[in-house]
């Protein structure tokens, strides 16, 4: 992934330009402050020459001017700082929202390829670095530029020779800073990857805490973390070394114009080309001029690490979006259909025609898969692990596109659908039920955000979970932790079923909903599923073949191909793959 700070197509810069009026105002105020410094310097310079020539000097007037200029400079500097901070906050807030929205639109394959810890690190740590770029480095760069221009004009007017002496070392500064920028960029990329790796281990340790304890893997994970931490520290030391080298070089280079100007000033004063007052004014402004002009490239060196982080964030924003059409439809048997939407009433709800799919090029997971599902049919998909069952569900949900072949939903090619509209026609109950941190009612209401409490209760009654919830101290307001770890597998499944009931969609996708449930709980869940599937088109990935005997049709997958299809009885009579699987079960 190209992580260079791309000026042509960079969302971060677009956000910077969006609020550029704020930073322009801050720059103008900063320019006025620097002009005030120059004006104060001129007052000192002129009055020293007056005093040395024997002319009278009004000390009181000079003090009044200095007080006025100092107060004005303080007020304007404060206002400029506030505007600069406001600019940074606005840009980062807009950029953060842009990234957050992108994460909901991004193609599902991005999440498959990027680690969870890496994405979290980018969204949190890299955003913080981007904010640091605006509040510290960018502000320093632009204020140094305005200051350098104003001071350069002042020094040039005092004496051109001194001006040349100040800028003579600048090519050396540019050359050295470019070298340091390249080194810092390379090291910063490695550093961010090391941080990702360490956070990845943390994430694994937290998510797999029970397994780690059960299998005694504490030492193994401690060693992994120790190694990752050491590698991170080593990279950080290199990064710090480059930064410290930049500081030392900057200080050494700053001495070059100072030494040159010291000798030249003596010669210019002696030759009468420079007055004592001008010399004093030059000496006072010299440090600020040198600091600002040399500070620009070295501020870029310091900002390089932040630019790498911005490049990583741009990687998210440049990732492929889910690509589908813009047509919006609802099936006629959805209870909450609205009149302003196109309504479909096709005989065939789902059609797969010679579907091929590969996660990696050349390694097909599905090969020439074809089937049609009528409205109201109860279909089961069975097969050995890795046969392509879950992949079919991912294609049905629009998480992936088929490599070849056609997938139609209600007679319309899936690529023509608005994907959100397509998914509104489906509800998923998975074997790995995910519950969000929050109350039980909130988790169920994700099926229909606008549902009333009574509707939630009715859904729970149909899902055979209402009595359990009512038995809890806080009932539906019971707060559950991430993943619902304090609930049993069966309880989580029934909450997921209640969520699907509340969504009230014509198509149900059931991904082995009873595979990890004991037989006692299985009957409760099966009863809930029967209520859920009544009058709906349902597709079930089955692990326990005993649960799908009543399916209208069973599709048998093997190595990504459909090898058999029929009713339970028909498949047993064939004596093929299904019969063998059923006998083994």
Question: What function would you assign to each model-found segment?
Answer:
Residues 332-585:
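ABC-type nucleotide-binding domain
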Residues 21-79, 83, 157-161, 272-276:
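Transmembrane helix-loop-helix hairpins at lipid-water interfaces of multipass membrane proteins
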Residues 84-85, 104-148, 207:
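Juxtamembrane loop-to-helix connectors within ABC transporter transmembrane domains
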Residues 36, 40, 58, 124-168, ...:
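Hydrophobic alpha-helical transmembrane segments of ABC transporter permease domains
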Residues 217, 241, 289-319, 325-326:
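Cytosolic ends of transmembrane helices, especially the final helix of ABC transmembrane type-1 domains
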Residues 66-77, 170-174, 243-257, 263, ...:
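Hydrophobic alpha-helical segments in the permease module
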Residues 108-109, 125-134, 138, 183-204, ...:
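An intracellular "coupling" helix at the cytosolic face of ABC transporter transmembrane type-1 domains
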């Amino acid at each position: 992934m190209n992580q260079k700070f791309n000026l042509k197509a960079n969302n971060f810069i677009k956000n910077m330009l969006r609020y550029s009026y704020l930073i322009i105002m801050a720059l103008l105020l900063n320019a006025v402050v620097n002009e005030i410094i120059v004006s104060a310097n001129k007052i000192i310079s002129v009055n020293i020459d007056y005093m040395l020539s024997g002319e009278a000097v009004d000390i009181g007037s000079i003090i009044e001017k200095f007080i006025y200029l100092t107060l004005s400079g303080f007020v304007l500097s404060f206002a400029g700082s506030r505007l600069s901070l406001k600019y940074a906050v606005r840009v980062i807030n807009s950029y953060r929202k842009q990234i957050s929205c992108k994460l909901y639109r991004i193609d599902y394959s991005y999440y498959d390829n990027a680690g969870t810890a890496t994405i979290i690190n980018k969204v949190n740590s890299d955003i913080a670095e981007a904010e640091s770029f605006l509040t510290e480095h960018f502000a320093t760069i632009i204020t140094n530029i305005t200051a350098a221009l104003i001071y350069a004009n002042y020094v040039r007017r005092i004496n051109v020779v001194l001006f040349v002496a100040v800028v003579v070392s600048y090519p050396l500064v540019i050359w050295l800073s470019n070298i340091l920028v390249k080194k810092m960029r390379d090291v910063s990329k490695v550093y961010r990857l090391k941080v990702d790796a360490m956070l990845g281990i943390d994430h694994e340790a937290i998510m797999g805490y029970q397994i780690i304890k059960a299998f005694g893997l504490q030492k193994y994970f401690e060693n992994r973390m120790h190694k990752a931490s050491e590698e991170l520290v080593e990279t950080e030391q290199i990064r710090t070394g480059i930064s410290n080298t930049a500081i030392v070089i900057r200080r050494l280079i700053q001495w070059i114009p100072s030494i040159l100007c010291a000798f030249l000033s003596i010669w210019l004063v002696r030759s009468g080309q420079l007055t004592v007052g001008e010399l004093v004014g030059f000496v006072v402004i010299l440090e600020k001029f040198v600091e600002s002009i040399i500070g620009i490239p070295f501020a870029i060196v310091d900002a390089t690490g932040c630019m790498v982080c911005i490049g990583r964030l741009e990687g998210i924003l440049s990732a492929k979006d889910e690509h589908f059409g813009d047509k919006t439809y609802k099936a006629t048997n959805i209870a909450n259909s609205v009149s302003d939407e196109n309504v479909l009433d096709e005989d065939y709800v789902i059609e797969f025609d010679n579907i091929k799919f590969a996660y990696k090029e050349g390694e097909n997971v599905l090969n020439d898969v074809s089937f049609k599902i009528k409205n109201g049919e109860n279909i089961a998909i069975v097969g050995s692990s890795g046969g392509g069952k879950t992949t079919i569900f991912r294609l049905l949900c629009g998480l992936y596109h088929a490599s070849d072949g056609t997938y139609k939903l209600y007679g319309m090619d899936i690529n023509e659908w608005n994907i959100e509209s397509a998914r509104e026609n489906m509800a998923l109950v998975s074997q790995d039920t995910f519950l969000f941190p929050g109350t039980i009612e909130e988790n169920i209401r994700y099926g229909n955000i606008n549902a009333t409490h009574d509707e939630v209760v009715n859904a729970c009654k149909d899902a055979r979970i209402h009595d359990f919830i009512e038995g809890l101290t806080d009932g539906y307001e019971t707060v559950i932790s991430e993943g619902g770890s304090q609930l049993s597998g069966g309880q989580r499944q029934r909450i997921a079923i209640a969520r699907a009931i509340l969504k009230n969609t014509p198509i149900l996708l059931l991904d082995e909903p009873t595979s990890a449930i004991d037989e006692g709980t299985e009957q409760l869940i099966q009863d809930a599923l029967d209520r859920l599937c009544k009058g709906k088109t349902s597709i079930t990935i089955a692990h326990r073949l005993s649960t799908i005997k009543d399916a209208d049709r069973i599709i048998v997958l093997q190595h990504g191909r459909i090898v058999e299809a029929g009713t339970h009885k028909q498949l047993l009579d064939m004596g093929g793959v299904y019969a063998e699987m059923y006998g083994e079960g």
